Curated annotation (Swiss-Prot):
UniProt keyword list: Cytoplasm, FAD, Flavoprotein, Monooxygenase, Oxidoreductase, Ubiquinone biosynthesis
Organism: Escherichia coli (strain K12)
Disruption phenotype: Cells lacking this gene are photosensitive and are not able to grow with a nonfermentable source of carbon. They also fail to produce ubiquinone, and accumulate 2-octaprenylphenol and 2-octaprenyl-6-methoxyphenol.
Record-level GO cellular component terms: cytoplasm; ubiquinone biosynthesis complex
InterPro entries membership: FAD-bd, FAD/NAD-bd_sf, Ubi_Hdrlase_CS, UbiH, UbiH/COQ6, UbiH/COQ6_monooxygenase
Subunit relationships: Component of the Ubi complex metabolon, which regroups five ubiquinone biosynthesis proteins (UbiE, UbiF, UbiG, UbiH and UbiI) and two accessory factors (UbiK and the lipid-binding protein UbiJ).
Protein name: 2-octaprenyl-6-methoxyphenol hydroxylase
Keyword Cytoplasm (UniProt): yes
Any Pfam family matching the protein: FAD_binding_3
Length: 392
């Protein structure tokens, strides 16, 4: 019997490819996705850019995926972290860790095209796209999924990779814990008068964190957080006003901000499932947890989930175990628990730490940034998580 994956965004598509590679096509996978990846309306493969940590790129290379993404990626050679209006900062450089890059920035629409090209020829993978789940039945020994096309699939384990507030997981009785941050993330691609040269920036401002990631064609991908109550004001700004405000918040490290492209915005919250497994069902990626974009940890955490689950399922199959058995799924959950809790905790703490303008706390966090800049062991702690070198 097979693995049935619902959701063909980054997490679901990568999981299908990982299982195919690790099992050499011996473990059948059905991947169900409602929207063709070529569509600009695809919610998982839109115009956004994401940063893949070096550790994530290494894992993608291991399963033969990175080789197809490398030509559309932009290397991050330096990360500069600072607190606006204060002296504290820390810089991470790839050369300090004998690396060519700390990570890579990719545009999701480009990634979607390449992942689905790989999926169409991956041994053991059957694509059901575009198609949707009409009904799910879970029995003691298997799962049965009926598609809107009328086809019925039978498998040992069901994977929810259908994003935040997963409809599949909800239908399977999973509860959610959510903490709204009362913040809005504004996303745009911007142009600057000074070349980024692979530099990425994380800047904490009075309104919220601001990240600039290097992209192709000299552009930068911007994620700029604002209090939720400023939504109407920020979204009403003209291009010129937006660039002026961004210049004031970001500074002149990349010279003049000359252009801002189409802007989109969404509210931010920490959302995570109370449990990542239930009867013959596993949650991965944003279906398991959706984090604040601060420090770019969410997607890389999801990729560690994906790789660990692929290994757990293929190992169970090799041993002749029922891979949907609760004991097998518990092994996966226990394996991921420490990293998941730590990453959620660190990300959530950073949001609250840098949102607080209480003077003693501001002084303390700037001392912390300066300490990391001056003392290599302290800086290495930040680097390990930035690089995605985290035990799975």
């Amino acid at each position: 019997m097979s693995v049935i994956i619902v959701g063909g965004g980054m997490a679901g598509a990568t999981l299908a490819l990982a299982i195919s590679r690790l099992s050499h096509g011996a473990l059948p996978v059905h991947l169900i996705e409602a929207t063709a990846p070529e569509s600009h309306a695809h919610p998982g493969f839109d115009g956004r850019a994401i940063a893949l940590a070096a550790g994530t790129c290494q894992q993608l290379a291991r399963i033969g995926v990175w080789q197809s993404l490398a030509d559309c990626a932009t290397a991050i050679t330096t990360v500069h972290v600072s607190d606006r209006g204060h002296a504290g900062f820390v810089t991470l450089a790839a050369e300090d860790y004998q690396l060519a890059a700390l990570g890579q920035v990719v545009e999701l629409h480009n990634v979607g095209q390449r992942l689905f090209a790989l999926l169409r020829k991956a041994p053991g993978v059957t694509l059901h796209c575009p198609d949707r789940v009409a009904n799910v039945a879970r029995t003691q020994s298997h799962v049965e999924v009926t598609l809107e096309s009328g086809e019925t699939l039978t498998g040992r384990v069901l994977v929810a990779a259908d994003g935040t507030h997963s409809a599949l997981a909800t239908a399977c009785g999973v509860d959610w814990q959510q903490e709204p941050y009362e913040q809005l993330a504004v996303i745009a691609n911007v142009a600057t008068s000074v070349a980024h040269e692979g530099r990425a920036f994380e800047r904490f401002t009075q309104h919220g964190p601001l990240a600039m990631l290097p992209m192709s064609d000299g552009r930068c991908s911007l994620v700029w957080c604002h209090p939720l109550e400023r939504r109407e004001e920020v979204l009403s700004w003209s291009d010129e006003k937006f660039c002026r405000e961004l210049q004031s918040a970001f500074g002149w490290r990349l010279g003049k901000i000359t252009h801002a492209g189409k802007r989109s915005a969404y509210p931010l919250a920490l959302t995570h499932a109370a449990r990542s497994i239930t009867h013959r069902t596993v949650l991965v990626g944003n279906a398991a947890q959706t984090l604040h974009p601060i420090a770019g940890q969410g997607f890389n955490l999801g990729m560690r989930d994906v790789m660990s689950l692929a290994e757990t399922l293929t190992q169970a199959q090799e041993r002749g175990e029922d891979m949907g058995d609760y004991g097998v799924l518990c092994r996966y959950q226990q394996r991921r628990q420490s990293d998941r809790e730590a990453t959620i905790g660190v990300t959530d703490s950073l949001v609250h730490l840098f949102a607080n303008r209480w003077a003693p706390l501001v002084v303390g966090r700037n001392i912390g940034l300066m300490t990391m800049e001056l003392f290599t062991p302290a800086r290495d702690v930040l680097a390990q998580r930035t690089l995605g070198w985290v035990a799975r």
